[in-house]
Amino acid sequence: MMKLSLLGSGLLLTALLLNGCGPSAAPDKAGESVFRYGTTAYGVAMENAGMDPHESYKGWSTLRYGVGETLFRFNEAMQPQPWLATGYEFLDDHTVKITLRDDVNFSSGARLTGAAVKACLEDLVKRHKRAADDLKLASITADGQTVTIKSQEKAPALINYLCDPYGCIIDMQRGTADDVKISGTGPYIVQSLTPTEIVLTKNPAYWGGRVKTDKVIVRSIPDGDTL
């Protein structure tokens, strides 16, 4: 329950930033709107200090701070709904065919395609044990704006697993070696990142519409009493 609550709070934060509703958003000297956010939920101790969703729990930061998005996400009733995907069809008990949106680009400028999703998920299961154990992938094939995933076992919960923050789709052509260069499909781009601070700038080409908050500064606060 706590995990689902954290996911909900992360999506709420992104929604506030998209709509320019952050409680501490204010213009800086350059006239940009800046949202400064202190949190106890980011840092080395949380295993989420970074933006590589294929490592530990960093996917929570990728999603929460608007850098990446998943193929599906949970609604308020905890039912998976399409996000970067438009729908899915189970071909059999082991296999699901997912159709992708055709109007999405990564912040790198590369287009979101079935091949891009395939490359991302293949890297995910190579490097992320929990994802590999959840998804139990036997194969992934891509064709245009579709990707077909076959599991080694019956996979009734496969779509639910793809809602997990580790499932943020990133541009593997940009790689994952440098957190600042990680390219997702979200409304924000990493400008700088340390274990205690993230500086994000808005993605001017975000597929979901105009991003109203120009810059976000996230600072880790080790003592909750100082919030």
Residue ranges with predicted function:
Residues 86-128:
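Aromatic- and charge-enriched surface segment that lines or borders ligand/interaction sites
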Residues 31-44, 95-99, 120, 147-149, ...:
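Short, well-ordered beta-strand elements
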Residues 120, 226-227:
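Short, hydrophobic alpha-helical packing/hinge segments within bilobed ligand-binding/sensory domains
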Residues 89-93, 97, 132-173, 187, ...:
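Surface-exposed binding/hinge segments that line
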Residues 38-91, 183-184:
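N-terminal lobe/hinge region of extracytoplasmic solute-binding protein
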Residues 31, 43-54, 79-81, 157-160, ...:
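Short, solvent-exposed loop/turn elements at domain surfaces
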Residues 161-211, 215, 225:
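Gly/Pro-rich hinge or "lid" segments in bacterial periplasmic/extracellular proteins
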Residues 1-35, 79, 123:
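Short, low-complexity disordered leader/linker segments with a strong preference
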